[in-house]
């Protein structure tokens, strides 16, 4: 019987599943690594509340062990005043206990030299009181019924397979993980595996169902999955059927679904992202969504429960499980103790033997003997911990004087504080970091208007740019700016020889415009070039044929002389091939096509397709037909005129064959009116209009405050990492460019800014760029510290004389940056000269065995939005995102809105990914690179089978087993009047909620109040001491 759901029930299943999956953040493919906040789905909660919820959902630790914070405290990185204030504030919410000075006890607790929890799990106050006073354990009979509510609560919080595992040690949940992961690998594979799941184009659940019905592995495992599938029609009906079979009511579905989906949150996050990525080729071809994944896991889980019920007698419905717990309470308490590991070691075998006999009376008798001993052991452990704590707090007498009910109050207070301790340490570290920053930044001074720097350089806001900017400014007359590394231009990019479009912009943006990369010297027979245009014009879902183009089409499209004369059809698989030769010099097609150009291109393409069709279908060679005949066939195929054609009179083609040929031109070769419109739409995406280019350049210049005093060179510096044998290579690239290198955006922006028509319009808007100012794209290679210049062949001849001076300055800054960076990677490199350090950086970047060619963005803590003059005299040691902004150029606050809504939010994602990857690398990071296995070309697993690893690898945030990154929330500093910044924050709702919710620590430095800092703390702005003014700066020519 197949259960078909009505529309209402179907929508309810889907909406419930979608909402249940929202706590799981998106996970992007590894080749475009996107930094993300692992708790993004919980950002509607205050930070402290969200970390508690995140710990439950992801079974993860949210703060580091106490000993790590104590080490930083010894190093002076913890603000003692904040520690004292937070302990005092939180002590007020703890239950009053006679003789217990909570601030003193909590301070002593945070200084204890171990990482144990303050309260032993499951301990009772009366047992602790007895142990403190040397009394024997209670001889009172164990009330089994009193133990069951807590047991039922723990089981109810789990999925049904997990609950059965907890009582019977069956391993169903792990087996279910294995089955789901294997099926996900088969379906989502992106041409890495030799075998892929058939029928994938029908969607995940449909393809999986067909394969599973015939899967011999299911039979060997004695799983009757086919029987379940016979009762369902699709994913939605499968979800309903399984939930009903397990006896779980609809009111419990949201919580249950969330537990199911967070079990493998990496795979869930990937499926969620993939379903939302409409541009992603693999998602278009092989669709899947969260309901498919949920249904597969539920169906497989039910099959495992049924198999366990048949062979072990375990329950397969939630109400049956509850009945077992109530009817066989003593047995279930013992089972849970044994399989959870919460058991006295010398009793484990005895309990196992008793359970294996299945005798209820024996279980009851054993529990009566065992449980008092277990509780006494817990009481003794807790008493010893309290005595140690009381001694540290100088309160031993107060502890001894506590009555049993007071001991309960003490334990409850310690329980209440336990999840807060990490937050207190974090606040104290952030307090120290804020104090440190406010002593480093200085009241900015504008340079004299007649002093023009030799060169200006725009860098990404990435923290790795801070050291090289600092060194570049100090080796010569350079002025640097910080801007999001996509330079404000969202780029859809089709690279030379690539088969698919990539997005070079923040993950929250979808670019409308497409830029093509084309060889500067075209080879008419070059298939890479053909595939570039072919991909633009042809929708892969409609046809696997690539168009055929001629020299004239290319001339009209690109303003170049050569293109191709006769080109062969290419399928998608061929488009993906790479020619293993050195990449030629290329140009970017940045300008919009006119309608006339687009029409001409399509006409030429269609003519070429007709020539090919004549040869392929009718064996008529090109030299036997003239242009008039080709034009006639095109007009008829486009339904602009009626037949017959000259094919009949010239070549004797029968009428029926002629009609078939015309139909093939339309259906197979794309010579069709509808497809023509589609081609025009695709061509319409190429390039940017003049208005768009002017807007992008004007916005960027205004945002960073560069509206006058332009240098001869303005470097537009993207960044990227170059490493070998590194699945996480894209994590070293530019997050603002979608996890790709920033050089594409740098080249696009420079080309726009150098265009005379753009400059003419900018001058009319009040920004005059001198004729001899040249915007030059460059790439900061963060793994080698080099700055590589691009498009030098376009450099005006009058600039060549200055080029070597520019390169000398860049090389000097690179060497100094390497000398600063190498000792952080390798302590033994501390004594290296700058040139030696640079050579070492280059060697590490190409070393296949090197698991850490750089620290990436580890160490990030600050986001500074303001003029460079605030920080130009500060050594921020690569800890700050530096965003250039001049509030005086932004009277309405629109530019600040954009900075807060995009770069600051992305900075917060980066910051919190490092935070959580550090505090629990096993669950929220990705573990050691040593055990990583690339999976399906889109992710990595640990070993051969695991959840997708979503965070940062251990080698990025840890050194020798200890945290290298210091987990603190982003401290965002804004240079602007307080009321002005406050109004802007009110308008940017997302950032406002992040600040109010404690996800971002905010500071405003008000230039209208003598550069007085205001720190947002506990819901209000706190005044701090005004900044000092820097010493007078000298400017060289």
Curated annotation (Swiss-Prot):
Source domain of life: Bacteria
For this UniProt entry, the molecular function terms from Gene Ontology, in alphabetical order, are: zinc ion binding
Q: Which GO terms describe its cellular component?
A: plasma membrane
Q: Which cofactor does it need?
A: Zn(2+)
**Chain residues that bind Zn(2+):** 460, 462, 719, 734
**UniProt key word Membrane:** yes
Keyword Metal-binding annotated: yes
User: Per its UniProt record, what Pfam families does this chain match?
Assistant: DabA
Name the UniProt key words of this record, in alphabetical order.
Answer: Cell inner membrane, Cell membrane, Membrane, Metal-binding, Transport, Zinc
Where does it localize? Cell inner membrane
- Tell me where the transmembrane regions lie: none
Give the way it sits in the membrane.
Peripheral membrane protein
Q: How does it assemble?
A: Forms a complex with DabB.
The protein's job, in short, is: Part of an energy-coupled inorganic carbon pump.
Note the PANTHER family from the entry: INORGANIC CARBON TRANSPORTER SUBUNIT DABA-RELATED, UPF0753 PROTEIN AQ_863
Question: What's the family?
Answer: Belongs to the inorganic carbon transporter (TC 9.A.2) DabA family.
* Protein name as it appears in the record: Probable inorganic carbon transporter subunit DabA 1
Q: Which gene encodes it?
A: dabA1
């Amino acid at each position: 019987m197949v259960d078909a759901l009505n529309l209402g029930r179907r929508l309810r299943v889907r909406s419930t599943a979608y909402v249940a999956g929202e706590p799981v953040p998106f996970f992007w493919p590894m080749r475009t690594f996107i930094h993300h906040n692992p708790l993004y789905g919980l950002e509607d909660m205050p930070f402290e509340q969200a970390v508690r919820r995140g710990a439950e959902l992801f079974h993860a630790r949210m703060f580091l062990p106490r000993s790590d914070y104590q080490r930083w405290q010894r190093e002076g990185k913890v603000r003692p005043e904040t520690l004292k204030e937070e302990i005092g504030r939180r002590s007020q919410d703890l239950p009053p206990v006679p003789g217990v000075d909570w601030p003193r006890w909590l301070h002593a607790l945070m200084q204890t030299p171990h990482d144990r929890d303050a309260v032993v799990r499951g301990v009772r106050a009366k047992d602790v009181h007895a142990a403190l006073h040397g009394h024997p354990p209670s001889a009172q009979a164990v009330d089994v019924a009193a133990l069951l509510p807590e047991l039922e609560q723990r089981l109810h919080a789990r999925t049904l397979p997990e609950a059965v595992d907890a009582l019977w040690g069956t391993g169903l949940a792990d087996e279910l993980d294995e089955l789901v992961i294997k099926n996900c690998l088969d379906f989502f594979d992106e041409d890495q595996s030799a075998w892929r799941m058939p029928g994938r184009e029908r969607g995940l659940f449909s393809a999986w169902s067909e394969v599973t019905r015939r899967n011999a592995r299911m039979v060997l495992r004695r799983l009757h999955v086919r029987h379940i599938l016979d009762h369902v029609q699709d994913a939605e009906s499968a979800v309903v059927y399984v939930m009903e079979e397990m006896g779980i009511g609809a009111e419990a579905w949201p919580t249950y679904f969330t537990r199911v989906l967070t079990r493998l949150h990496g795979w869930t996050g990937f499926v969620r992202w993939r379903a939302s990525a409409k541009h992603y080729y693999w998602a278009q071809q092989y669709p899947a969504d969260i309901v498919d994944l949920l249904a597969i896991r539920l169906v497989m889980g039910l099959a495992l429960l049924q198999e366990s019920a048949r062979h072990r007698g375990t329950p397969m419905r939630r109400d049956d499980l509850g009945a077992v717990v109530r009817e066989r309470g003593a047995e279930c308490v013992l089972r849970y103790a044994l399989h959870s590991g919460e058991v006295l070691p010398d009793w484990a075998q005895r309990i196992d033997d008793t359970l294996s006999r299945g005798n209820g009376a024996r279980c009851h008798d054993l529990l009566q003997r065992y449980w008092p001993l277990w509780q006494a052991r817990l009481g003794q452990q807790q008493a010893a911990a309290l005595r140690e704590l009381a001694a540290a707090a100088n309160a031993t007498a107060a502890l001894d004087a506590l009555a049993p009910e007071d001991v309960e109050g003490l334990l409850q207070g310690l329980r209440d504080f336990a999840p807060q301790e990490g937050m207190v340490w974090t606040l104290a570290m952030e307090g120290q970091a804020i104090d440190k920053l406010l002593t480093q930044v200085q009241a900015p001074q504008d340079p004299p208007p007649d002093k023009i720097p030799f060169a200006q350089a725009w860098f990404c806001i990435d923290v790795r740019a801070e050291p090289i900017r600092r060194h570049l400014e100090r080796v010569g007359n350079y002025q640097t700016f910080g801007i999001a590394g996509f330079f404000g231009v969202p780029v859809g990019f089709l690279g030379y020889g690539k088969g698919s479009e990539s997005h070079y912009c923040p993950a929250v943006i979808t670019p409308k415009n497409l830029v093509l990369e084309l060889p500067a010297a075209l080879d008419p027979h070059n298939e890479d070039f053909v595939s570039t245009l072919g991909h633009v014009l042809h929708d892969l879902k409609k046809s696997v044929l690539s168009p055929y183009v001629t020299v004239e089409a290319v001339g009209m499209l690109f303003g170049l002389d050569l293109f191709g004369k006769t080109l062969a059809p290419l399928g998608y698989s061929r488009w993906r091939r790479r020619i293993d030769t050195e990449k030629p010099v290329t140009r970017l097609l940045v300008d919009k096509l006119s309608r006339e150009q687009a029409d001409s291109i399509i006409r030429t393409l269609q003519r070429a397709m007709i020539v090919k069709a004549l040869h392929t279908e009718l064996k008529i060679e090109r030299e036997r037909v003239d242009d008039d005949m080709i034009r006639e066939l095109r007009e008829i195929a486009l339904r602009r005129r009626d037949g017959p054609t000259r094919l009949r009179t010239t070549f004797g083609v029968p009428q029926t064959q002629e009609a078939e040929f015309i139909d093939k031109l339309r259906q197979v070769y794309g010579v069709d009116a509808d497809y023509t419109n589609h081609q025009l739409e695709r061509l319409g995406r190429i390039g940017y209009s003049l208005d768009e280019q002017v807007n992008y350049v004007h916005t960027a210049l205004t945002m960073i405050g560069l509206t006058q005093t332009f240098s001869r060179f303005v470097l537009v510096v993207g960044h990227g990492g170059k490493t070998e044998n590194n699945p996480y290579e894209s994590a070293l690239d530019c997050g603002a460019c979608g996890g790709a290198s920033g050089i594409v955006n740098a080249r696009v922006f420079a080309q726009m800014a150098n265009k005379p028509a753009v400059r003419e319009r900018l001058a009319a808007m009040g920004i005059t760029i001198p004729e001899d100012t040249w915007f030059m794209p460059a790439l900061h290679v963060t793994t080698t510290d080099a700055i590589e210049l691009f498009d030098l062949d376009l450099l005006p001849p009058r600039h060549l004389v200055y080029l070597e001076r520019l390169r000398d300055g860049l090389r000097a800054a690179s060497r100094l940056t390497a000398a600063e960076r190498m000792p952080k990677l390798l302590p033994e490199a501390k004594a290296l000269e700058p040139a030696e350090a640079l050579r070492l950086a280059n060697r590490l970047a190409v070393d296949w065995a090197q698991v850490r060619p750089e620290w990436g963005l580890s160490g990030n803590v600050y986001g500074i939005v303001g003029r460079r003059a605030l920080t130009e005299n500060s050594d921020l040691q690569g800890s700050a995102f530096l965003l250039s902004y001049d509030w005086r150029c932004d009277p309405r606050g629109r530019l600040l809105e954009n900075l807060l809504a995009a770069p600051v939010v992305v900075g917060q994602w980066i910051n919190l990914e490092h935070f959580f990857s550090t505090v629990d690398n096993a669950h929220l990071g990705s573990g050691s690179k040593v055990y990583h296995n690339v999976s399906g070309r889109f992710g990595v697993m640990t070993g051969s089978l695991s959840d997708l690893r979503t965070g940062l690898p251990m080698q990025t945030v840890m050194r020798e087993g200890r945290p290298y990154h210091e987990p603190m929330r982003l401290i965002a500093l804004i240079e602007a009047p307080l009321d002005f910044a406050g109004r802007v924050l009110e308008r940017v709702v997302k950032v406002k909620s992040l600040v109010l919710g404690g996800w971002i620590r905010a500071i405003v430095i008000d230039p209208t109040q003598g550069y007085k800092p205001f720190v947002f703390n506990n819901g209000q702005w706190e005044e701090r001491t005004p900044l000092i003014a820097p010493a007078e700066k000298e400017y060289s020519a």
